[in-house]
Amino acid sequence: MARTKQTARKSTGAKVPRKHLGNKSSQKSFPSTQGLKKTHRFRPGTVALREIRRYQKSSELLIKKLPFQRLVREIAQEFKTDLRFQAAAIQALQEASEAYLVGLFEDTNLCAIHAKRVTIMVKDIQLARRIRGERA
């Protein structure tokens, strides 16, 4: 079939409806994504840095009180039964425990960074405790 030259035509101004090539069933087969909005996601690490800044600013306890209290009572049960604790005693134990854990994780993070990693591992905790002199 030979090609023919296209010539410009003058438009009449009236809109002519276009013919749809496919039938209606083929149009419905694709789900419409017009109403769905994509959920916003932060880049990896952004939320972690925000949480670090938030917890460094605050002075509240990081572990919930009741689970910590149950843990203390469970450990104390192994040594002596029917022990009672004052609320201030459990509060003091929790403050000391959290201070110890935060310090340990800081040292652990330094060990991971020294090994050119950003993820802490068990060997980092072991090294931090060994340097501190807690474990030979």
Swiss-Prot record:
It is found in: Nucleus; Chromosome. The modification N6,N6-dimethyllysine is found at residues 5, 10, 28, 37, 80. The keyword Nucleus applies. It comes from the Eukaryota. Its main location: nucleus. The keyword Ribosomal protein does not apply. It holds the Pfam family Histone. GO terms for molecular function: DNA binding; protein heterodimerization activity; structural constituent of chromatin. One of its GO terms (biological process) is cellular response to UV. The modification N6-methyllysine is found at residues 5, 10, 19, 24, 28, 37, 80. The modification N6-acetyllysine is found at residues 5, 10, 15, 19, 24, 28, 37, 57. The modification N6,N6,N6-trimethyllysine is found at residues 5, 10, 28, 37, 80. Residues 23-36 have a biased composition (Polar residues). Acetylation is generally linked to gene activation. Different methylation states of H3K4 mark distinct developmental phases. H3K4me2 is associated with euchromatic regions. H3K4me3 is a mark of active chromatin. set1 is responsible for all mono-, di- and tri-methylation of H3K4. H3K4me facilitates subsequent acetylation of H3 and H4. Methylation at H3K9 and H3K27 are linked to gene repression. Keywords: Acetylation, Chromosome, DNA-binding, Methylation, Nucleosome core, Nucleus, Phosphoprotein. The modification Phosphoserine is found at residue 11. Residues 1-41 are annotated as: Disordered. One of its GO terms (cellular component) is nucleus. Belongs to the histone H3 family. Core component of nucleosome. Nucleosomes wrap and compact DNA into chromatin, limiting DNA accessibility to the cellular machineries which require DNA as a template. Histones thereby play a central role in transcription regulation, DNA repair, DNA replication and chromosomal stability. DNA accessibility is regulated via a complex set of post-translational modifications of histones, also called histone code, and nucleosome remodeling. The nucleosome is a histone octamer containing two molecules each of H2A, H2B, H3 and H4 assembled in one H3-H4 heterotetramer and two H2A-H2B heterodimers. The octamer wraps approximately 147 bp of DNA. This is Histone H3.3 type b. The gene is H3b.
